Amino acid sequence: MAEAEKTVRTLTGRVVSDKMDKTITVLIERRVKHPIYGKYVKRSTKLHAHDETNQCHIGDKVTIRETRPVAKTKSWALVDILERAVEV
């Protein structure tokens, strides 16, 4: 029997914390339509992602993918850094 290939979930967001070792916190923002009023409202989710080489910094725009659980709250991994934060 052929196994159906799973699609890997990927998300894009901004790094809001890099204080943990090999872990980043990524803020994912999305727009959803209010069920009654019809106005589009911003909703956000914070996810912990594995950053093996500690290469991300606050403000970077990154892509993460779902992976096996690495820790109690960490089941996403860094795929790519799309845009570096501007350093002052």
From Swiss-Prot:
<keyword id="KW-0694">RNA-binding</keyword>
<keyword id="KW-0699">rRNA-binding</keyword>
<dbReference type="GO" id="GO:0022627">
    <property type="term" value="C:cytosolic small ribosomal subunit"/>
</dbReference>
<dbReference type="InterPro" id="IPR019984">
    <property type="entry name" value="Ribosomal_uS17_bact/chlr"/>
</dbReference>
<dbReference type="GO" id="GO:0003735">
    <property type="term" value="F:structural constituent of ribosome"/>
</dbReference>
<keyword id="KW-0689">Ribosomal protein</keyword>
<comment type="subunit">
    <text>Part of the 30S ribosomal subunit.</text>
</comment>
<dbReference type="GO" id="GO:0019843">
    <property type="term" value="F:rRNA binding"/>
</dbReference>
<dbReference type="Pfam" id="PF00366">
    <property type="entry name" value="Ribosomal_S17"/>
</dbReference>
<comment type="function">
    <text>One of the primary rRNA binding proteins, it binds specifically to the 5'-end of 16S ribosomal RNA.</text>
</comment>
<comment type="similarity">
    <text>Belongs to the universal ribosomal protein uS17 family.</text>
</comment>
<dbReference type="InterPro" id="IPR000266">
    <property type="entry name" value="Ribosomal_uS17"/>
</dbReference>
<protein>
    <recommendedName>
        <fullName>Small ribosomal subunit protein uS17</fullName>
    </recommendedName>
</protein>
<dbReference type="GO" id="GO:0006412">
    <property type="term" value="P:translation"/>
</dbReference>
<keyword id="KW-0687">Ribonucleoprotein</keyword>
<dbReference type="InterPro" id="IPR012340">
    <property type="entry name" value="NA-bd_OB-fold"/>
</dbReference>
